[in-house]
């Protein structure tokens, strides 16, 4: 497959994710308007993370890494019948597994809450238990959506699977608007039911197109099928690795419940902004590359094949860096403008915007490492190596726990600030752990494929360009400081984006030049 085709697939993934994330930002703005950083916001944010463990453990990332490589190879070999059998068998396994886990999760919710929200007591704890139990079945449905995504992606039908969460977001938005007259503690109960409805709708919009792609599929629990065994072997390793990542997130959440009211809601709000570049550029490129890398993968001892894989990986890393470097710089320098424009409304105050900006800046520390790491992990999965990412994820977990505890609980006291500000240290320390994991992923893959990574000269040019653009944007921010948040953001962020593209074009950075030339051709100038 050509680089142009790969970019086209990444563009489709990015377009789908952009639709989903934009509606996600609208959902978060409506949520922030009604709840701010209140106890109710903390409760729903924490509750949503508990069943999401199930989705992340068995859902999109794990199924993509274990199912797509095997399924895509069968399609490439024109074995449609075998591919259909595999799809049906995996669907049957998921149906059985998820039903059992959802039932156990609902029953064990009180015990789970002691682990991931030890700071919640009394009415706050009881309401969180109720919300978690409502949400669990919906999250099980989302795992089926991930199965749909695996099939659609393998057939290079990228847009629908990543745009489908739009209906999930719409369901939540409409629920909040319809029942906005209720008190916050009652509104979040209705919101939980609206979330479950959204999960069902997200699955249904993908179901029809998927069934057309697998005409011979039958739901059959065929555990003896050799291809099912291959998926199962990879699935276990990836699921454990993904579980480690989720445990890392739960460690952060458990610590944040000890930081006072608003900490979890603040981290969730910052995460909604942080996930936009991660999804648009990191996930889009990694997800679109996995089927192609899987088709290319074979014996990495073959020098020619190793060279092709390395070149493909490096090209993806350069594309990620071009967009993620300015995103991280924006979090550091312009996060206040961004957060205020998105969420400063109703119960969400200017003070809340500054607090979320600080958390967002902390998350910027590991933004590049986490997005690079996704593509490296996809390359390992394409090579059918799930153990290496697992080992490195365990290292990351250990550092996340140690650094997170120290940063969140000890540093605020050392600097004489409120304990709530420990959330900033929590996100920054997670970023440091992410860099350690990325270094380990890269070092081992380099020993197998040869040198990989982005040239330091290119990285330096990108950071300098982002820095110059940030200075220009800060100047505009100062000049227009009396304007409202949305108007201010339009001018400041436009200046930042244009200045960054101008600087990278002056540097003659390949991706920028190609984008400008493509735009010029479409406008029929030059």
How would you describe each model-predicted region?
Residues 1-526:
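Membrane-embedded alpha-helical bundles of multi-pass transporters/translocases
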């Amino acid at each position: 497959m050509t680089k142009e085709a790969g970019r086209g697939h990444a563009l489709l993934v990015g377009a789908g994710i952009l639709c989903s994330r934009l509606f996600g930002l609208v959902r978060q703005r409506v949520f922030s308007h009604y709840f701010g950083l209140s106890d109710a916001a903390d409760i729903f944010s924490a509750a949503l993370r508990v069943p999401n463990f199930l989705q992340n453990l068995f859902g999109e990332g794990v199924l993509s890494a274990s199912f797509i490589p095997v399924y895509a190879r069968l399609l490439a070999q024109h074995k449609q019948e075998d591919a259909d059998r595999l799809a049906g068998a995996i669907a049957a396994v998921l149906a059985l597994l998820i039903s059992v886990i959802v039932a156990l999760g609902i029953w064990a919710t009180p015990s789970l809450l002691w682990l991931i929200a030890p700071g919640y007591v009394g009415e706050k704890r009881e309401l969180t238990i109720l919300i978690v139990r409502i949400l669990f079945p919906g999250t099980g449905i989302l795992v089926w959506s991930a199965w749909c995504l695996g099939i659609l992606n393998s057939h290079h039908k990228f847009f629908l699977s990543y745009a489908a969460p739009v209906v999930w977001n719409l369901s939540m938005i409409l629920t909040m608007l319809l029942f906005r007259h209720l008190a916050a503690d009652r509104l979040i109960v209705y919101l939980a039911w609206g979330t479950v409805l959204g999960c069902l709708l997200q699955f249904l919009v993908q179901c029809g197109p998927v069934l057309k792609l697998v005409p011979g599929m039958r739901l059959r629990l065929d555990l003896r099928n050799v291809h099912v065994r291959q998926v199962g072997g990879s699935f276990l390793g990836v699921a454990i690795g993904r579980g480690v990542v989720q445990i890392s997130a739960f460690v952060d959440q458990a610590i944040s419940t000890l930081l006072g009211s608003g900490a979890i809601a603040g981290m969730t709000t910052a995460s909604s902004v942080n996930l936009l570049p991660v999804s648009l550029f990191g996930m889009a490129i990694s997800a679109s590359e996995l089927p192609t890398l899987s088709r290319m993968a074979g014996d990495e001892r073959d020098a020619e094949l190793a060279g092709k894989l390395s070149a493909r990986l490096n090209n993806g890393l350069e594309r990620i860096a071009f967009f993620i470097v300015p995103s991280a710089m924006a979090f550091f320098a312009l996060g206040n403008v961004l957060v205020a424009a998105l969420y400063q409304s109703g119960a969400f105050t200017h003070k809340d915007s500054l607090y979320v900006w600080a958390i967002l800046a902390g998350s910027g520390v590991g933004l590049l490492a986490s997005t690079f790491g996704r593509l490296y992990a996809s390359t390992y999965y394409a090579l059918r190596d799930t153990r290496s990412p697992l080992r490195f994820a365990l290292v990351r977990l250990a550092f996340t726990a140690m650094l997170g505890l120290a940063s969140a609980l000890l540093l605020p006291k050392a600097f004489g600030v409120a304990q709530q500000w420990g959330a900033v240290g929590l996100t920054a320390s997670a970023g440091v752990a992410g860099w350690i994991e990325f270094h380990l992923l890269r070092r081992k893959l380099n020993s197998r494929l040869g040198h990989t990574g982005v040239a330091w000269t290119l990285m330096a040019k990108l950071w300098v360009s982002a820095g110059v653009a940030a200075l220009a944007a800060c100047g505009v921010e100062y000049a227009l400081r009396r304007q409202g948040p949305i108007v201010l953001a339009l001018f400041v962020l436009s200046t930042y984006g244009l200045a960054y593209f101008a600087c990278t074009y002056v540097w003659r950075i390949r991706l920028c030049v190609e984008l400008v030339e493509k735009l010029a051709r479409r406008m029929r100038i030059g």
